[in-house]
Amino acid sequence: MEENEGKEKKQKKKMQAKRWLAGFLGIFLAGLAGCMALVIWVDPFFQYHKPLAWFPYLVDNQVNQNPGLAKHMDYDGILIGSSMTASFNTDWFEELMGMKTQKLSYNGSYPKDLSNIMQLVFDAKGDQVKAVYMAVDQSTFSADPEETKFPVTDYLYDDNVFNDVPYLLNKDVLLDYILRPLADRKDASDWAELYKPWWTDEYYNKANVLMYYEAAEEKQEEEALAADYFKDAVEENLQKNILPYIEAHPETEFYIFYPPYSILFWNDVTREKELEAVIG
């Protein structure tokens, strides 16, 4: 009898342990499902839908948020380039050019970055894209044609929803891009000024710039770079990363321009005897 009672107690304990484990797993899986559902609903990286009208989105991660913006925002044109373009207000393009323009800047962007985002744009919008405003940075167009400035988050750049788990179950996405904006709405991004640099006219003025400016060391004439120093690398980038989109989309106007670098930048370029190479 005692032996049977002991067996029954052990079986009860096993059953209780199984129930507890099943309950824990159920709660755990329900929590994961809830987190995934919340991320899909708010979608702070815009992978599945347009922004919710009421949500105070924080848009400050170019590599991870630009792909969704390219896929799901409404626009006639795009603005691409480095951090120089991040200072632009896209309302200007609508006022002056009549184009609803989406900013898709990448700080320090290489031509491959521009190619990646243009591929997404044209795949998503096709001939709806009326204009591409592309800033050409002299210092980056000689980069390796297959290199991006920062590592690309592949699962955000493709259309495979089955590899999105790192996005859907991401602590930083949940805390920094959903809960924090809800708790403090003052950090919500202005859609016309996405990725706007932190400096303002109050701090970014002639006196402050000159206070911290240190001129580059001046080189001798014999150290000057040849005018065609960057030519081959730039041509390779144009052939691989830029011209294919221009040729494939005759319905789209491409406005290619040099962004307005500071005169101090050009002073450094001149002192380093690189002016002919940079503008060549």
Label each PLM-derived region with a short phrase.
Residues 135-136, 145, 149-253:
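Secreted/periplasmic serine-hydrolase-like ester/acetyl group-modifying domain
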Residues 1-19:
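N-terminal Lys/Arg-rich, disordered targeting/topogenic segments
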Residues 84-165:
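Membrane-embedded segments
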Residues 22-41:
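Hydrophobic membrane-insertion alpha-helices, especially the h-region
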Residues 74-76, 99, 127-131, 249-254:
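Loop/turn elements at helix/coil->beta-strand transitions in domains of secreted/extracellular proteins
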